[in-house]
Regions:
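Conserved Radical SAM active-site core
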Residues: 1-110, 117-133
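Short, solvent-exposed loop/turn segments at secondary-structure junctions
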Residues: 33, 79-80, 103-105, 143-145, ...
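Surface-exposed cleft-lining segments at the edges of enzyme active sites
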Residues: 106-114, 142-152, 190-199
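Short, surface-exposed amphipathic charged segments that create phosphate/polyanion-binding patches used
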Residues: 113-115, 186-189, 237-243
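Conserved C-terminal portion of the radical SAM core fold
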Residues: 119-186, 210-229
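Substrate-binding surface in catalytic domains of secreted glycosidases
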Residues: 174, 191-212
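A C-terminal junction/extension of Radical SAM enzymes
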Residues: 202-294
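Local cysteine-cluster metal-coordination motifs and their immediate loop/turn environment
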Residues: 291-312
Length: 312
């Protein structure tokens, strides 16, 4: 049984009654960097109780209510602007954790509008100390090979960052750039005269084997994001970035949340696990993601083409 988001009625700012999706888990956001550029917007909409999304093709509005939200997963390359507002989520008993992408492509200027790498490393450490290392997941994503940046150079850069993040996170997630399947990215790199090299099974395994050795020092969980290649022999798993098992582990005292992740629905009962049992095996996998994505169902509240990092 595929779990679906609940629907509720809300009153909009202009007094209209409309139907809204009321997700348990919010993704903020795969589509844009809300913490870096839209923290105030996010908090203002949280205070209002809902946000509006517009269909990019016909501009038709749809509404997302925060009435039942228990967890927000933030995706970002710079969470610093959001940090002062985290107390507002805590005051509303809304849990959260971060997918923090911390790459090192400064020389190549692939991410032209992000802070310098040392500043990002310090922000990572500060956030980890504030909310706990289990809630800040390090992403080196994607791994990009070029004529000048081969496997050894990528490993050197990952090692440099990893050595500084030791003790400040529990997990490293990475993916291999599949540039030829993303025409816009390929066109951008060609325009910049960047000679990129797509990964193959041999180069992916070469990188993963060396990363396995580096990780003997860090002792992190290693995982790939939406990759088909099997690297389990190197103790590298397929990731769930919006991770139901992680949510259960770190927010174990939220009975409604645990009930949703077990039965596919929330409960207002006082007992942790009421007598009802699922009639069928529930499917919490997000049906709107790629084939090899293991994410738990969520609702993304970002808008495409609004990210100001201007990544190539």
């Amino acid at each position: 049984m595929q779990v679906k988001h609940q629907k509720v009625s809300i009153i909009t700012d202009d007094g209209k009654s409309v139907e809204a999706t009321a997700p348990i888990v919010i993704s903020a956001s795969r589509r844009t960097d809300i913490p870096a550029f839209y923290s105030k917007w996010f908090i203002n909409r949280l205070r209002k109780g809902y946000c509006v999304l517009y269909n990019p093709f016909n501009q038709k509005p749809s509404y997302v209510s925060f009435k039942k939200t228990r967890v927000v997963v933030f995706w970002t390359k710079n969470p610093k602007p959001l940090i002062p507002f985290l107390c507002e989520l805590e005051d509303r008993s809304i849990h959260y954790y971060f997918q923090f992408t911390l790459n090192d492509y400064e020389k190549e200027n692939f991410e032209p509008n992000i802070p310098k790498i040392q500043e990002r490393i310090e922000t990572f450490k500060q956030l980890s100390e504030k909310i706990g290392k289990e809630k800040v997941i390090w992403r080196f994503d994607p791994l990009i090979q070029t004529k000048d940046v081969g496997i050894e150079e990528l490993l050197r850069r990952v090692e440099y960052v990893g050595n500084q993040l030791k003790g400040y996170t529990e997990k490293l997630v990475f993916s291999f750039a599949d540039i030829e399947n993303y025409r816009k990215v390929a066109d951008n790199l060609r325009r910049e005269k960047i000679d990129y090299i797509d990964f193959n099974d041999r180069s992916m395994f070469q990188f993963a084997k060396a990363l396995f050795v580096l990780n003997k020092n860090w002792k992190l969980k290693l995982a790939t994001c939406a990759e088909s290649i099997d690297l389990e022999q190197l103790e590298i798993e397929h990731n769930s970035c919006i991770d139901g098992e992680l949510i259960k582990r770190i927010f174990y005292d939220d009975k409604d949340l645990l009930h949703f992740l077990t039965f596919g629905k929330t409960t207002t009962n006082d007992t942790l696990f009421p007598s009802d049992t699922p009639e069928k095996s529930i499917n919490l996998k997000d049906p709107n993601q790629r084939k090899y994505c293991g994410c738990t169902i969520s609702k993304d509240i970002g808008i495409y083409n609004t990210c100001l990092h201007f990544c190539k």
